[in-house]
Swiss-Prot record:
It is an enzyme of class 2 (transferase). The keyword Lipoprotein does not apply. It is found in: Cytoplasm. The keyword Lipid biosynthesis applies. Belongs to the PlsX family. The lineage of its organism: Bacteria, Bacillati, Mycoplasmatota, Mycoplasmoidales, Mycoplasmoidaceae. It comes from Ureaplasma parvum serovar 3 (strain ATCC 700970). This is Phosphate acyltransferase. Homodimer. Probably interacts with PlsY. Keywords: Cytoplasm, Lipid biosynthesis, Lipid metabolism, Phospholipid biosynthesis, Phospholipid metabolism, Transferase. Its EC number is 2.3.1.274. One of its GO terms (biological process) is fatty acid biosynthetic process. Its main location: cytoplasm.
Length: 331
């Protein structure tokens, strides 16, 4: 049986290298029958962390890293960086997918320049999984890759995200993020996307307001990169603020009894909205399976992102996306 090959960029993020190497080892041993993980980075730093397992992991050596403060322009001077090398390996079909925690803007630009877009696609999109109150997720895209979009772009985002959502839900509900649910609301590209989606065979429910995202009114929610990014960061910020507020209140002597009683509920809420369980965001629209995790990712987040990447490759999602796009565009 041919093994799934994953490229793992080990450089350019804010946390210790131990997190990514431990995640690589543990995830490999969970799937060693059909998985190979190719580590891209500084071999002198990676090998000691692998201990006796170093023979199990091919290493693409480089000492050049794209840093979080690099720009697209400065990154061009680092053609031998771990990110560039991994992308070239993916383009040359030496692997099935790639995971990085590196610089987001540089990653999207270089992935676009190296791998290219799928047929029918004009813009890429970042798609994270947003945890919802019922324990599920909403596929939210775009959250920052493409700010200047039209209705066709949103329509294409919906097709691609719908393909991935079908891995979890047989008939995913699709919506467009807007300031109201009425058909006349929004900008021209909202109206254009609305009309295109209405005439498609997707399970389209219409416009969706930001206040219902966490209630999983839809399984796929499409937006321009500016609005989607604001929505995502607002949810993350509110979650952290409420969590910190409750922690501070529970520390007060007068609230100790209430804290003990509500601790199980608090843990349940925290688990429901834990982004670490869904720490990988797809870069959709490119001719490859690419996942980006947080620049400050820890062991758990790398494990989560590897799981997302592995399952997507195993389900042959890239070819399914191509089929769905061709079906809509009559090829």
């Amino acid at each position: 049986m041919e093994k799934i090959k994953i490229l793992l960029d080990t450089m350019g993020y804010e946390n210790d290298l131990e997190h990514v190497i431990k995640a690589a080892k543990d995830f490999y041993y969970q799937h060693e029958d059909d998985l190979e993980i190719i580590l891209v980075g500084n071999e002198q730093l990676i090998k000691p962390l692998l201990d006796n397992d170093w023979r199990l992991f091919p290493i693409v050596h480089t000492e050049v890293s794209i840093e979080q403060n690099d720009t697209i322009l400065s990154a061009r001077k680092k053609q031998n960086s771990s990110m560039h090398l991994a992308l070239r390996y993916l383009k040359d079909k030496q692997a099935d997918g790639m995971l990085t925690a590196g610089n987001s803007a540089v990653f999207v630009y270089n992935a676009y320049a190296t791998i290219g877009l799928l047929e029918h696609i004009k813009k890429p999109a970042f798609m994270p999984f947003v945890p919802t109150i019922d324990g599920g997720v909403t596929n939210l895209l775009d959250v920052g890759a493409s700010i200047d979009v039209d209705g066709t772009d949103l329509f294409n985002f919906a097709i691609m995200a719908n393909t991935i959502a079908k891995m979890r839900t047989p008939n995913p509900r699709v919506g467009v993020l807007n300031i109201g649910t009425e058909d006349h609301k929004g900008l021209p590209y909202h109206q254009e996307a609305n009309e295109l989606l209405k005439t498609s065979n997707l399970n389209y429910v219409g416009f969706v307001e930001p206040k219902t995202i966490l209630e999983r009114e839809v399984d796929v929610l499409v937006a321009d990169g500016f609005s989607g990014n604001i929505a995502l960061k607002t949810m993350e910020g509110v979650g952290k603020t409420i969590s910190n507020f409750l922690k501070n209140e529970y520390k007060k002597p007068k609230n100790l009894f209430a804290a003990l009683l509500s601790k199980p509920i608090f843990k349940k809420i925290k688990k429901a909205f834990d982004y670490k369980e869904h720490a990988g965001a797809f870069v959709l629209g490119l001719d490859g399976i690419l996942v980006k995790t947080h620049g400050s990712a820890d062991y758990q987040q790398f494990m989560s992102a590897l799981k997302i990447l592995y399952e997507t490759i195993k389900a042959d999602v890239l070819n399914e996306i191509k089929k769905d796009l061709n079906n809509y565009y009559g090829q």
